[in-house]
């Protein structure tokens, strides 16, 4: 078995990756022990503001092994073939309520896998917010859904917040209407959600 060189992290050609934390800030993990890559998962998420004022959030997931393995459904699966390949899109309004949802299983390990796509529109009407993972699991998880598509809805929710609030702030900056009250309101919504938004954080 050989290690696929494409599994190596894609680091920019520079001695130290850029960081705002100063020259002494550590930007790489500790040296790895001798090892061999065996599995690679890639997740790509993107947020879009639409011409009609809604937002599309899209996600793509792929899994690859570094070695050949047998599949009763697919025959021999080689490293260049995805074990899993799923794409999805949700459309939300400014209140983070899902207006449209679709998913496609491009590649899966079993013939029945695409059947899970049929339950994805159960997400329509749900609001991204507290309890999101629980609501997703109830709507599309379990025996009628797909584990990997369900997992994707975690980062999708994060991108929805990043796209929606980032775009609203950008529009206000461009129009000169962004106020300190807006900034404080945004911060209060995220209070104590992480170290940066902790009540005792020194960051403004």
State where each predicted segment sits:
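Active-site- and interface-proximal helix/loop "cap" or "latch" segments in soluble metabolic
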Residues: 47-49, 61-204
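Short, Gly/Pro- and small/polar-rich lid/capping loops
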Residues: 8-69
């Amino acid at each position: 078995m050989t290690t696929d060189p494409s599994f190596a992290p894609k680091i920019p050609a520079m001695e130290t990756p850029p960081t705002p934390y100063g020259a002494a800030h550590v930007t790489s993990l500790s040296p790895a022990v001798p090892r061999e890559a065996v599995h690679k998962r890639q997740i790509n998420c993107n947020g879009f503001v639409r011409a009609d004022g809604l937002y599309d959030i899209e996600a793509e997931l792929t899994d690859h092994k570094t070695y050949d393995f047998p599949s009763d459904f697919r025959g021999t699966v080689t490293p260049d073939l995805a074990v899993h390949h799923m794409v999805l899109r949700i459309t939300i309004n400014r209140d983070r309520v899902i207006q449209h949802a679709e998913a496609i299983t491009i590649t899966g390990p079993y013939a029945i896998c695409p059947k899970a796509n049929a339950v994805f529109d159960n997400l329509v009407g749900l609001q991204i917010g507290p309890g999101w993972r629980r609501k997703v699991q109830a709507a599309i998880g379990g025996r009628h859904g797909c584990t990997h598509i369900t997992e994707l809805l975690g980062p999708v929710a994060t991108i929805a917040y990043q796209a929606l609030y980032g775009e609203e702030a950008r529009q206000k900056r461009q129009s000169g209407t962004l106020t300190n009250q807006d900034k404080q309101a945004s911060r209060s919504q995220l209070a104590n959600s992480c170290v940066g938004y902790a009540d005792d954080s020194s960051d403004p």
